[in-house]
Amino acid sequence: RMLEAASMIVNRPTYYEISISNVDKPVLPQEELERRAARVTSKGNSIIVTNAPRFTEKSSVLPGAKFIIGFDTYIRLMDKHYYPDHVAGKHSPVENSLDLIYENGCGFVVAGRVDDQNQFRGLHDVEFEVPARFRNMFTELTEEQFRSDLSSTEIRNQTR
């Protein structure tokens, strides 16, 4: 449903992307990749499989893409913990990474999420400030446009 809601904003074809490698998880086993891909394609959707664990790599492989992400992923995108090897450049590792994503013509559509206190949180409900030069890279899916109280992991577990 998030992809459907975001497709109205980006006004172009949308695809699922799955990476066989992930910063926080082990390499995705072949059988799990096939299972997830089959679930997506059985509903008439297209999927792109990459070996790009971070959005810096994804933006290089898929220049011009608008990545549709959930709030939890947005928080991780802004976390310097995920960029230990991106120290070159004149800014913080996060800003250097956003620079590369921006240079590749990419952006993000971000869906909000309900927190532990049952409050819906979106782009404007975070404790950090996105540098002004990057703000136009982010578009928010409002609560009215899309709301799911389940994480992507919970959704995957329900469909097993």
Q: Which residue stretches match the model-derived regions?
A:
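Nucleotidyltransferase catalytic core that binds NTPs
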Residues: R1-R160
